[in-house]
Amino acid sequence: MESFSSKSLVLQAEKKLLSKMAGRSVAHLFADETSSEVLDELYRVSKEYTRSRPQAQRVIKDLIKVAVKVAVLHRSGCFNPSELALATRFRQKLRQGAMTALSFGEVDFTFEAAVLASLLTECRDVLLELVERHLTPKSHGRIRHVFDHFSDAGLLTALYGPDYTQHLGKICGGLRKLLDEGKL
């Protein structure tokens, strides 16, 4: 017996379409103004740190693709109860990471790259477990790329150093607003 599911086909088409569209400009369609500003600032930090515009664009594009695909999966009700528990755990870890990043940015001499890198690695692992049966290995690679990039100790140390003060201030301001509004 052939199993046909229009819902599955629609979901595949949505994911395929969104994967072709994802870019910094598309982020503004799926994210609010504050989220877009944080993404733009993360792009600037990545570009400055790597000294590579294409590399910075790739990491932000991958971040957007993954975020949109996970949102589509969630909105479409594709997650079973254990996966919904993982989604909650991921959100809690991401929120904890944002609050830790804010604390490090607001309190002098408290920054520890290893702590932030560890939180980001935990987020990556939970997200990979969440989407394991839903996304392709290519998407799993995108998740690893994004989290490995932003958990790099060199990047984190530079971000919290004197040369990136303006970037860090804007990122922290955006994170604070997202946390206050309950969007993160």
From Swiss-Prot:
Family note: Belongs to the TNFAIP8 family. TNFAIP8L2 subfamily.
PTM annotation, UniProt: Phosphorylated by TAK1/MAP3K7; this phosphorylation triggers association with BTRC and subsequent ubiquitination and degradation. Ubiquitinated in a BTRC-depdent manner; leading to degradation mediated through the proteasome pathway.
Chain's role: Acts as a negative regulator of innate and adaptive immunity by maintaining immune homeostasis. Plays a regulatory role in the Toll-like signaling pathway by determining the strength of LPS-induced signaling and gene expression. Inhibits TCR-mediated T-cell activation and negatively regulate T-cell function to prevent hyperresponsiveness. Also inhibits autolysosome formation via negatively modulating MTOR activation by interacting with RAC1 and promoting the disassociation of the RAC1-MTOR complex.
InterPro entries: TNFAIP8-like, TNFAIP8_sf
Database matches in Gene3D superfamilies: Tumor necrosis factor alpha-induced protein 8-like
Location in the cell: Cytoplasm; Nucleus; Lysosome
Organism: Bos taurus (Bovine)
Primary location class: cytoplasm
Subunit structure: May interact with CASP8; however, such result is unclear since could not reproduce the interaction with CASP8. Interacts with RAC1.
Domain of life: Eukaryota
Residue(s) carrying Phosphoserine: S3
Name of the protein in its database record: Tumor necrosis factor alpha-induced protein 8-like protein 2
Swiss-Prot/TrEMBL domain comment: The central region was initially thought to constitute a DED (death effector) domain. However, 3D-structure data reveal a previously uncharacterized fold that is different from the predicted fold of a DED (death effector) domain. It consists of a large, hydrophobic central cavity that is poised for cofactor binding.
One GO-annotated biological process of the protein: negative regulation of inflammatory response
Keywords carried by this UniProt record: Cytoplasm, Immunity, Innate immunity, Lysosome, Nucleus, Phosphoprotein, Ubl conjugation
GO cellular component terms, A-Z: cytoplasm; lysosome; nucleus
